[in-house]
Regions:
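Short, extreme N-terminal segment that most often corresponds to the first beta-strand
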Residues: 1-23, 82-83, 97-100
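A short, structural micro-pattern
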Residues: 4, 40, 75-77
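Short loop/turn segments at strand-loop or loop-helix junctions that form parts
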Residues: 47-51, 84-87
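Short, compact, well-ordered microdomains
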Residues: 60-100
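Acidic, aromatic-enriched beta-alpha/helix-loop junctions
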Residues: 33-34, 41-43, 52-74
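An N-terminal amphipathic alpha-helical segment
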Residues: 15-50
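Short, surface-exposed beta-strand/loop "edge" segments at domain boundaries and coil↔beta transitions
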Residues: 16-18, 53-56, 88-93
């Protein structure tokens, strides 16, 4: 049977504008140690791997706002986190104003 992965899609307002800028950097130069794939102009796909949640060395490269989203996806047994401009705002997660 093929593997079918769960995706959590949430609003990109759950990360700061600064963090979004880091996600937009070319993978080879990205300061965040994650598998990140752009979703055109609307957001990002992020692989939620066990090592991200469990390894404190990897977590030090991940901004806390993004780590909160990753932990939320992990708690809901998702393999992928999709941060999308039109995604749902989750009351348990902090939101940020990108217009500052």
């Amino acid at each position: 049977m093929p593997q079918i992965d769960k995706v959590l899609t949430i609003s990109s307002l759950h990360i700061t504008l600064d963090t979004s800028g880091k996600l937009d950097v070319e993978p080879a130069f990205c300061p965040i140690d994650l598998s990140i794939f752009p979703k055109r102009d609307w957001g990002w796909w992020i692989l939620v791997e066990p090592c991200i949640v469990e390894d404190s060395d990897i977590r030090t490269t991940i901004p806390e706002d993004l780590m909160d989203c990753i932990r939320y996806a992990w708690r809901h047994d998702c393999t992928w986190l999709c941060l999308d401009y039109d995604g749902e705002v989750i009351p348990e997660l902090k939101t940020y104003n990108w217009e500052e």
